[in-house]
Amino acid sequence: MELRQLKYFVGVAEDLHFGKASKKLFVSQPALSQQIKLLENELGTELFVRSKRIQMRQVVLTEAGEMFLAEAKNILQLSEKAIRIVRQISTRQKVVTLGVFKLILPERIMGMLEFFSAHFPTVEVKLVELPNPVQVQEFVANAQIDLGMTVLPLISKGLHAVQYAEADYTILMKRDHPLAGQDAVRLEELRSDKWIDHGRETGLYFEQLNEACRQANFSRESNIFHYVPSFDLLKSMIRLGKGVAFIPATLDLTQEPLLISKPITNSDGTPFKQVVIEHVLIHKSSQPIVELMARTVKQGRHGTNPQYPGK
């Protein structure tokens, strides 16, 4: 019996719905069903009543399931308590520096700080704001910060990335752009626009985005007006009406009254599927407490903690 199986069981038992539980637990429904079945086989009894008359993957607890739910919760609580005690002993009087790309939404940053505070109450997290995502990687690589929050795919060697969230791409444009009044923009509607980008080496998913545009029957790369080294310059170029740009939906634009970001759809109206991954970065030779914090972020993504910053 694994703690993971107990978490899965509690998740389904609380929602009484495999579909809802699978989303909260970040696991596919088939995998969730398989783990529950393995747990039932080990216990030698069914924990849920499954009926074809029950629609939408809903279930109800058996009598054994109701009794096991209370015990499973106790086991998980004891496990979490043991982990907290060990962490408190091993992380006393520690100071960790967290560097963040300054355009990440404040809610994401505060969520990460609260998450660390809840799991590492004796660790002081000092926040450092950095102007662009590349610099976050450079600072981690050069040991100027311990952890980094950024949206850029790895370009620096010696780093380890832990995904904590993902975000849809949107189109950043000036508010007087002809398409700014639409609820969403079809990618093919941008075939005549000029583009601002960071370039092949440091751009966010540069090749994937170019391929998406080719699928929409136009070449974005040949329409790129200018490559810029930072998001500040990218925004400045767009404020001047020099083009449009792909940006993650989680970037903070509250201080940009002249700019607006729009959701993207495919030509058939379906949502644009390309997403950008948000990472916590650490150096591969980080001190143990930093590795533990990154590992906790990874575990949090696959758990049910409502405070998790990527939820």
Where are the model-predicted features located?
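N-terminal short secondary-structure element
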Residues: 1-35, 68
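A short LG(V/I)-centered, amphipathic sequence patch enriched
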Residues: 40-61
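Alpha-helical linker/hinge and terminal dimerization helices associated
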Residues: 42-46, 68-90
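Central regulatory/effector-binding core of bacterial HTH transcription factors
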Residues: 93-156
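Hydrophobic hinge/microswitch elements
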Residues: 131-136, 141-145, 151, 201-263
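Beta-alpha-beta core module
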Residues: 157-163, 167, 232-285
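Flexible hinge/capping segments at coil-to-helix
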Residues: 161-169, 173-195
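Secondary-structure junction motif
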Residues: 193-217, 289-294, 298-300, 304, ...
